[in-house]
């Protein structure tokens, strides 16, 4: 008989920096998951990714308290801020521009996000990411 999924937990954890403190500890602890086991497995899986980059993770907790997890690509907004070299987006994106991104940078981000975004070609993903950039107060060149 297959294990029954008891809960799905969605978190954003910094790559290579998972530890038992909030938000990881309380979220996993309330479902009876071994927190240190998750932290070690997550850090091992994300060691090739730039340390500190927020990584969305979906943890499936089973009825015997075991778990599996799937990591996603970093959010587009984080990748855009990194590409533009800004700390945060604009509070007033239509009037106050905080940086610029090029078409080549959008292409690179779209290719990175391709694994998570389904049903769209690279051009459609680029347009979607360009919209995100504009809503953050970034100028899209190209």
Swiss-Prot record:
Keyword RNA-binding in annotation: yes
PTM notes: One or more lysine residues are methylated.
Lineage: superkingdom: Bacteria
One Pfam family, short name: Ribosomal_L11
A Gene Ontology term for the protein's cellular component: cytosolic large ribosomal subunit
Molecular function in Gene Ontology: large ribosomal subunit rRNA binding; structural constituent of ribosome
CDD domains, per the entry: Ribosomal_L11
GO biological process: translation
NCBIfam families from the UniProt entry: L11_bact
The protein's role, per its UniProt record: Forms part of the ribosomal stalk which helps the ribosome interact with GTP-bound translation factors.
PANTHER family linked to this entry: 60S RIBOSOMAL PROTEIN L12 (PTHR11661), LARGE RIBOSOMAL SUBUNIT PROTEIN UL11M (PTHR11661:SF1)
Family designation: Belongs to the universal ribosomal protein uL11 family.
HAMAP family recorded: Ribosomal_uL11 (MF_00736)
Protein name: Large ribosomal subunit protein uL11
Organism: Aliivibrio fischeri (strain ATCC 700601 / ES114) (Vibrio fischeri)
